[in-house]
């Protein structure tokens, strides 16, 4: 079913059904079986409609090597976040009406700017901050991506921070994310 969802999503990207000029991009973190095997999930969303353009999971190294238990000490963990970000940017390029008018918004992470300039050199890239204090009067400029990220954490049990249901294989997480794309974008899948 996940393969059907991915094929349908690719078809809609190629046909131009997800065309946009305004994209929001972010990453969320989860883990594979244990917190010492972190996974980054790169996410690109149409800012007006909330439709998902791309979701890619990739492993990365733990930040604090000294606190890793002995059984994970010798384990090499590659950092493929940049590959996931580049895959998302290539999907954004497919969905862009025109690269000149494309606006990409994200949080203040320093990982995104180089990849955006390399893959989408003519697009405009804006780094925004969400308000720290949550008042009703405050406007969150990254509301749509933050909303989709929170729905992802809520709707997918394996994305929850503290849970009995954890991801054992990153490939299965990617399949689950592909199904979430189909659900969020309203695709009708027939087996």
Task: Map each language-model feature to its residues.
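Residue-level recognition of single "structural anchor" positions
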Residues: 1-191
């Amino acid at each position: 079913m996940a393969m059907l969802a991915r094929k349908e999503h690719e078809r809609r990207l190629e046909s131009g059904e997800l065309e946009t000029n305004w994209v929001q991009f972010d990453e969320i973190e989860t883990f594979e079986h244990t917190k010492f095997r972190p996974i980054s999930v790169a996410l690109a969303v149409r800012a007006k409609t909330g439709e998902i353009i791309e979701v890619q999971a990739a492993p990365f190294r733990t930040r604090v090597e000294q606190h890793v238990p002995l059984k994970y000490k010798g384990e090499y963990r590659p950092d493929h976040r940049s590959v996931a970000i580049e895959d998302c940017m290539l999907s954004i390029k497919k969905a862009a009406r025109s690269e000149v008018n494309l606006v990409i918004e994200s949080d203040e992470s320093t990982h995104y700017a180089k990849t955006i300039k390399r893959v989408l050199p003519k697009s405009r890239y804006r780094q925004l901050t969400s308000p720290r204090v949550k008042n009703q009067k405050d406007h969150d400029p990254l509301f749509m991506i933050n909303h989709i990220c929170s729905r992802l954490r809520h709707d997918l049990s394996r994305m929850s921070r503290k849970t009995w249901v954890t991801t054992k294989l990153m490939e299965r997480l990617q399949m689950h994310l592909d199904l979430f794309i189909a659900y969020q974008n309203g695709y009708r899948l027939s087996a």
